[in-house]
């Protein structure tokens, strides 16, 4: 009997806005992979909306994750998304150190901002922590805003050429032992 594939989805659950675990879990499930959620927050709408409810799960994450450790779960992949605090990055780093093996991979979507602006929940300290987290990624999926932030580069208001984007992705890839850096939009 073939082992059930599992991916840890370390991300928020957002009610409105077509993002987060609400989008990831059905896609992963359709691929016959078990989506194992690790919630970082619950939001009524994503943070680009002018108003939203934000319930930070930082204080609950360690106990939540401990259950997975006690069950001796293993994962075929670990995927991170929206993180709501510096402490959450540390919790995620511990998760990766515990569950990462030579048979799985880590995907980090930095989820820091869009269109040249960081989300309101992001601070300089959070950006520094995200720079630490991406070192553990096999695959990074930043958008242009996040790529510039991770590289401490100015956001190109008029866009960037394919060559400039390749160069930026290459610089980010050099900062860790990873398989791939893929650029999303924004």
Where do the PLM segments sit?
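Conserved N-terminal subdomain of the carbohydrate kinase-like
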Residues: 2-108, 112-120
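Conserved phosphate/ATP/ADP-binding segment of small-molecule kinases
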Residues: 121-186
